[in-house]
């Protein structure tokens, strides 16, 4: 991992000729580069690559030297690791970071010592993020008074309050002290903001709105680059920011090429022209693998993962808009049998959709086998069958005008979110931790780490009873089912209940990410990034558009960092 991007030329521009560059449809929204400008950007990537590689290698060498010096300073090494994570360059230092945090964990239960609020909260958060279980009560109880309340003098420590709020996001179930810590820190940070300068207010507000653990790190790198420009007291920060700028631009170039390749695949597939009722947004769908699988060296894996993600959206639209109950039943049977001949009685658009699904899945299984010496076809087929069976169940409900019980709806809707299907593909494409135990968990159970992400996605989607762009179908929502189960419940109360469920599910997800864990650290990070991506994908405006997602696409793909 430390050398994941030592040869960026192996990722950028070697898979698709310039003549095949096509213009992403999503990226012509207001404020996006024009189609010609986008083509010029991709051309420029290749022209500037050699110089960027040289500068990046030099910056990485200097950053490693800075890390080796600062790691010996126990007053700074946690601050340094936090900076690396926020600047998006921590993947270069994974082994070194693990060594530092293991040392911190081993001594955390040593003789009782007084710590500053910010130090204690930062250590707790970094260890929890790394999978270590640190009892919250052991860390934060000493910050309370005799009445069991957080000490009032802590309210004067703005930095400490920010770290305390960040730490509270790592809470697990029945950890009341972290719930109290989150409420306490949020209250006083909000009290402070009217009295701070503009720059400080932006930092505090950003912490409250986008706590690090629940936010895609890559989407906030630019904010932290700006922030650290104001924090010059640690000279190693400047070294890290120089690397972060080069790293951001280099990975941006990789992602532009990946989206171009997926667009070419989608256009050549031809399904969009045959299924005009379905969504046609491959560039939007690409964002799932781009933010989930963050290791720059896993470029082909992201490209392949975008294919089943696209097919999930397409097949979802077929079940919502593109077939009769009998046709959908036959389609589901074909997926369960996994036979081309089973589609003979289906309409043409369903035949070609199944053929695309069949071919893509078999191709991915073959590539996984070549790379990791394991053939996952059984697991992939089973995941698709499970998804389509759930789609069919929902289609039958709504064709009959039936509104199921809330729990019954959610159990099925968690599957139709597509999260399990996508994360099964992610697991095998990444190839880390393929064991009998993990395979059995994926095939026969619904691992909590996956079902938690699926629950968060489904509830976020249903929170606004959101309709996706250009989609006219109706498939109910948890809120409607809940209000039917509990007559007299207002929409506001139902929404508050869903918000509470999302918060509780995040606690479950945090629990499932702690060690010991049968899944690899890289897969755990991918699942967490899926949960972090959800608010961007489902934050619809009144016109059923996604302005925040579009702004993130613009920032991540087309707005480079000045060096």
Swiss-Prot record:
Q: Does the keyword Signal apply?
A: no
Q: Does the keyword Hydrolase apply?
A: no
Please list the residues that bind Mg(2+) 1: 316, 320
**UniProtKB keywords:** Lyase, Magnesium, Metal-binding
Co-factor binding comment:
Binds 3 Mg(2+) ions per subunit.
The EC number(s) attached to this protein equal: 4.2.3.-
What Pfam families has UniProt attached to this entry? Terpene_synth, Terpene_synth_C
Q: Name one GO biological process term.
A: diterpenoid biosynthetic process
Which residues are listed for Mg(2+) 2 binding in this entry? 316, 320
In this chain, Mg(2+) 3 is annotated as bound at: 469
Q: Which SUPFAM superfamilies match?
A: Terpenoid cyclases/Protein prenyltransferases, Terpenoid synthases
Q: Under which main EC class is this enzyme filed?
A: lyase
Top-level taxon of the source organism: Eukaryota
Q: Where is this motif: DDXXD motif?
A: 316-320
Cofactors demanded by this protein: Mg(2+)
MF term (GO), any = magnesium ion binding
Reported function = Probable sesquiterpene synthase.
In the record, the note on similarity to other proteins reads: Belongs to the terpene synthase family.
- Free-text domain note: The Asp-Asp-Xaa-Xaa-Asp/Glu (DDXXD/E) motif is important for the catalytic activity, presumably through binding to Mg(2+).
Miscellaneous: Does not produce any detectable product when tested in vitro.
Q: What is this protein called?
A: Probable terpene synthase 4
Species assigned in the record: Ricinus communis (Castor bean)
